[in-house]
UniProtKB/Swiss-Prot annotation:
It comes from Streptococcus agalactiae serotype III (strain NEM316). The keyword Cell inner membrane does not apply. ATP binds at K258. PROSITE patterns: AA_TRNA_LIGASE_I (PS00178). This is Glutamate--tRNA ligase.
Length: 484
């Protein structure tokens, strides 16, 4: 095994980058960068049935968007896709066959299904029963000849040491062990189509690429003893394994499901909605790991410096969309204006709102944004029809002092010349209404805000009125007075 730390992220190109897989990549990336090691990308494309066109490109594009870089990948190195490594796998399969550590299996899918059904009806744990048990060499040869004559293409199975104990000290979960008798019998290492199975190919790849640490989700724990069997059969040292806990929905407490449409689970979704990649990176880094303390906002460089595998959580990581949005808002509020405007610009352009007011509108709503696509509904006031009032807003406007406040403020606005109507002159007009009417606080400000914007909350009121313009602000107040 290599002395230098080398980790890998090895996705299957079967679709978009899920947040769980992004976390796997990110923790491997942080671990490698913290220790001065190598971060390797390898594509595991042996499952041809689930292969998705452009799946590999999507994975790499989204990792790059998150801000990860890598040292080796199919983009720069040959044979970093499993489909390009079939000769290498065949070499080791032939070796195991020659050494009697693996054998060709001619049992059919129908026979396997029938045996599985029998075992289940008998209350037995389903497992493969070696088809050659009880056969003499002559009977075995006749069986193989008959099967091959029938056109049956064999698989290759690894001969499992049923009395073996397969254990490791997990980087996250501590000591774990499996008995060879509980693996399910001799298992397939090469399918009928000539492709290796995952648990075989991954061992060959990790050894060949000198991977020192395998950090992945704990859904892979059951795969680890099988992989240890391959390491043992080939006489190789296994890497260190670390299995991260599941990501669960913070509201239901259940495993995060791709069918849950209330949460954004694919990195592509965050890109399309205009989240800052730095915010998504920060959020994912805290799913099952924390550096200690109360602080939650970290730059990429800080996360690299702080990353400590000993602080990987043993408890499930809660995915909280509200926390993601809070964190995203914090990043957008504190980002430079040019970066935020660049994110908002495509959404404004698509909505036909890239006017001379666009920059001022983004500046106005920047503190409220959780994602850049929100700039369109937030600016409806300036482009769309006046919104219907909510019940809470109607209740505010039902107060007997509202007509007095609105009429007085309208008069103040009308009295201002175009030159006098500026952002800085609006607040003094509101204070003048307070002085004249004796109405103050929410009873003063809230009716004006609702009458002008149709909302109880929003940017600073003088900013909204100034950008809306005197004429339109007066028009909105007149319309509201007519409804009272």
């Amino acid at each position: 095994m290599a002395n230098k730390i080398r980790v890998r992220y090895a996705p299957s190109p079967t679709g978009l980058l899920h947040i769980g897989n992004a976390r796997t990549a990110l923790f491997n990336y942080l671990y490698a960068r913290h220790h001065g090691g190598d971060f390797v990308i390898r594509i595991e494309d042996t499952d041809r049935k689930r292969h998705v066109e452009d799946g590999e490109r999507s994975q790499l594009e989204n990792l790059r968007w998150l801000g990860m870089d890598w040292d080796e990948s199919p983009e720069t190195h040959e044979n970093y896709r499993q489909s390009e490594r079939l000769e290498l796998y065949q070499r080791y399969i032939d070796q195991l066959l020659a050494e009697g550590k693996a054998y060709k299996s001619y049992v059919t899918e129908e026979e396997l299904a029938a045996e599985r059904e029998r075992q289940e009806l008998a209350g037995e744990t389903p497992r493969y029963i070696n088809e050659f048990i009880g056969m003499s060499e002559t009977e075995k040869e006749a069986y193989i000849a008959e099967r091959e004559a029938s056109g049956i293409i064999p698989t290759v199975r690894l001969a499992v040491n049923e009395s073996g104990i397969y254990k490791w000290t997990d980087m996250v979960k501590g000591d774990i062990e499996f008995e060879g008798s509980n693996i399910g019998g001799d298992w397939v290492i090469q399918k009928k189509d000539g492709y290796p199975t995952y648990n075989f190919a991954v061992v060959i790849d990790d050894h060949d690429m000198q991977i020192s640490h395998v950090i992945r989700g704990d859904d892979h724990i059951a795969n680890t003893p099988k992989q240890l069997m391959v390491y043992e059969a080939l006489g190789w040292e296994a890497p260190q394994f670390g299995h991260m806990t599941l990501i669960i929905n913070s509201e239901t407490g259940k495993k995060l499901s791709k069918r849950d449409t209330n949460t954004l689970q694919f990195i592509e979704d965050y890109r399309k909605k205009g989240y800052m990649s730095e915010a998504v990176f920060n959020f994912i880094a805290l799913l099952g790991w924390n550096p200690g303390g109360e602080e939650e906002i970290f730059s990429r460089e800080q996360l690299i410096n702080l990353f400590d595998e000993n602080r990987l959580s043993k408890s499930p990581a809660a995915f909280d969309q509200k926390k993601m949005d809070w964190m995203s808002n914090d990043y957008l509020k504190n980002a430079d204006f040019e970066s935020v405007f660049a994110l908002c610009k495509p959404f404004l352009e698509e909505a036909g709102r890239l006017t001379d007011k666009a920059e001022k509108l983004v500046e106005l709503y920047k503190p409220q944004l959780k994602s850049a696509d929100e700039i369109v509904p937030l600016t409806d006031l300036f482009f769309a029809d006046f919104p219907e009032l909510t019940e809470a807003e109607k209740e505010v406007m039902a107060a007997e002092t509202v007509p007095t406040v609105l009429s007085a403020f309208k008069e103040k606005l009308v009295s201002l010349s175009d030159e006098e109507f500026t952002r800085d002159t609006i607040f003094p007009q509101i204070k003048a209404v307070q002085k004249e009417t004796g109405i103050k606080g929410k009873n003063l400000f809230m009716p004006i805000r609702i009458a002008v914007s149709g909302e109880m909350h929003g940017p600073e009121l003088p900013d909204t009125i100034y950008l809306l313009g005197k004429e339109k602000s007066v028009q909105h107040i007149d319309n509201m007075l007519a409804k009272l």
